[in-house]
Amino acid sequence: MSKAPAVGIDLGTTYSCVGVFQHGKVEIIANDQGNRTTPSYVAFTDTERLIGDAAKNQVAMNPTQTIFDAKRLIGRKFDDAAVQSDMKHWPFEVVSADGKPKIEVTYKDEKKTFFPEEISSMVLTKMKETAEAYLGKTVTNAVITVPAYFNDSQRQATKDAGTIAGLNVLRIINEPTAAAIAYGLDKKAVGERNVLIFDLGGGTFDVSILSIDDGIFEVKSTAGDTHLGGEDFDNRLVTHFVQEFKRKHKKDLTTNKRALRRLRTACERAKRTLSSSTQASIEIDSLFEGTDFYTSITRARFEELNADLFRSTMDPVEKALRDAKLDKSVIHDIVLVGGSTRIPKVQRLLQDLFNGKELNKSINPDEAVAYGAAVQAAILHGDKSQEVQDLLLLDVTPLSLGIETAGGVMSVLIKRNTTIPTKQTQTFTTYSDNQPGVLIQVYEGERAMTKDNNLLGKFELSGIPPAPRGVPQIEVTFDIDANGILNVTALERSTNKENKITITNDKGRLSKEDIERMVNEAEKYRNEDEKQKETIAAKNGLESYCFNMKATLDEDNLKTKISDSDRTTILDKCNETIKWLDANQLADKEEYEHRQKELEGVCNPIITKLYQGAGFPPGGMPGGPGGMPGAAGAAGAAGAGGAGPTIEEVD
């Protein structure tokens, strides 16, 4: 069997997407619901775990056990200001475990806590399975994307999530870089082109400027806001309608999580409608305390509610231009990425900023990142086709990196927006006479003083021979690999003593043991999900056997043939089973199968006797051999999602 291709996964804050490069082109893969993007949602119920559409669809009924926005927590500390402010908006519980955030849920009547990496790994597992269902092969290799603003800890945690999901992460790349690759494959241009990528997604906003020259991408600058996106526009709508509901009905629906959730779902729908229509209506039956809510909103009102947010998206564009030292007149192309770039007002503001320049919308904004990631995955996985051979990728560091020197000053070794992989060495010395050692403290950030930057890790270099201050020479080397993982080495020249650190664990990263445990747990949950599916199939099989059997008794050719006592025997047994089913919704697979055998033991001899007695040809039995209700698992197949439609309530 040929090996499966590597896939590209856009692990988004609100939605995720997976693509694969094969037969010379990228295919974005639809999930089992037929959607090309999958909500980054995981839900826990009394009986099962749901991921993706199924999780998002039941969020109104189960808000406290439905987890989303794991990307806002991944690689962060619990007391991080962003985490603390986000927690106010989440219906689920976030607790601190050794300074790291964990999400607390009740699953199968037990309290469980999960690291953000575990939740993200469940979404990644869903994307992996989506690709496997399409390719018909086991998928192990993947490129996963992250926002340009993610620091080392967040990148590392995302990589860990991939490992827990059973993926070999070939590389972590920036989302805008991935979009640029997608764009580069679409439009091969002669000479150097400067491209501005405007990525306004569900949860993050990134602006990047790249130069593309002869198939080589270079990221000139990145800017943005890790906390701006479609969800913020939804929030404004929700607030607007909550106030309207108060005015109209004198009731405050913020006291009811489920009502808020249903309103939010309707707002998201209205927002999407307003990208193509100038008006959208909202109709929610019995939203709060039996009160229906019917209203509408115009595009103009929507734009007014979000005016400041829309305008604020222009600042990072100007910052990115300043950082890249480019005038807006030399930008050749503007590329839109992220679902929120469909909003006409955002497009208009951007176009006005660039003096009416046409925007590039040729790539589906929801899929561009996964598209580029799929191409990059093919390159790294050794795809030899001409289409990808002409592409090379240069990524950059999102923040400056350096060490603390005397007086708490940040001494930068690697400037932000430096192309990676990269290696920089600088020589430092001692601050006082006969100093026996130095403490190397590694920081990331743009501020002059280290106290305002982010400490990545620290280590001691001891054993420096006694000498006056300023004499010893200590060589500090910063080495960043293609994944943005940093190695820092300090070497004392006279003794050749050295010490080093890899910036991973010191940042509250999960330990190897943790990751292994989570990999095993992920496997356990997968098995439980499988078991749950089989149980439901057995239950549905038994149910349809009962109803099919009752229907068989009413068929014209049987009505007259069957004796009243046989008829009563079957009916009683079927009704008894249906009653048992109603009372035992949570029985296990074996019980359902046992009941089915019992029922078949009663019904089959009677039905067989009838058919033989009547001399019907075997094909005349309902549906031919094996077509008897539930025989040979026919009814069970429908329950297992074979032929039977799955109906989910969308609230």
From Swiss-Prot:
Q: Where is the composition biased (Gly residues)?
A: 621-630
Give me the Gene Ontology terms describing cellular component: catalytic step 2 spliceosome; cytoplasm; cytosol; nucleus; perinuclear region of cytoplasm; plasma membrane; precatalytic spliceosome; presynapse
According to the record, the residues making up region (Disordered) are 621-651
For this UniProt record, the keywords arranged alphabetically read as follows:
ATP-binding, Cytoplasm, Glycoprotein, Nucleotide-binding, Nucleus, Stress response
**Origin: domain of life:** Eukaryota
Q: What InterPro entries would the database entry show?
A: ATPase_NBD, Heat_shock_70_CS, HSP70_C_sf, HSP70_peptide-bd_sf, Hsp_70_fam
Under Pfam families, the record lists:
HSP70
Instruction: State any GO BP term from the record.
Output: chaperone cofactor-dependent protein refolding
Which ranges form a coiled coil?
Answer: none
Q: Which GO terms describe its molecular function?
A: ATP binding; ATP hydrolysis activity; ATP-dependent protein folding chaperone; heat shock protein binding; protein folding chaperone; protein-folding chaperone binding
Record-annotated disulphide pairs: none
User: What phenotype has been reported when the gene encoding this protein is knocked out?
Assistant: RNAi-mediated knockdown is lethal in larval third instar (L3) stage.
- Which locations, inside or outside the cell, does it occupy? Cytoplasm, Perinuclear region; Nucleus
Instruction: Share what the entry says about its subunit structure, partners included.
Output: Associates with the elongator complex; this interaction is required for some functions of the elongator complex but is not required for regulation of microtubule dynamics.
* Stated name of the protein: Heat shock 70 kDa protein cognate 4
Which organism does this sequence originate in?
Answer: Drosophila melanogaster (Fruit fly)
